[in-house]
């Protein structure tokens, strides 16, 4: 799943209340060093559309301004991998000699889809493809935790 390209955008998919399938809510795009969000027209036209987080991303068309001091909407940053998930991704990238590409969009698009919350990030606006992780044993999980903790590269099976 790791790519050598730098991502320029990510589509934000959301599970709306009472729905079992996600819908594309909008797009997060690079704007210099910032990532800005724009709701999709089809999302805004939905009768059941809800703001992803009203203080930062109210339901309205156009690129939404960033809160002062932030380089991207905080609610979307909260939906991306935490420090441990980023550390695992860094080790995965280090194994592939492209750790320098671990920016925010890479973290969003290369982490697993089975996250807490009702958001996921995809490369497509038309097809939702979950990024699933194969189940591992408790022993394998402990082994990978020890490896990352001690700065050792993960095996391809555990990455």
Language model feature labels by segment:
Residues 1-159:
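Phosphate/dinucleotide-binding and metal-coordinating scaffold of catalytic cores
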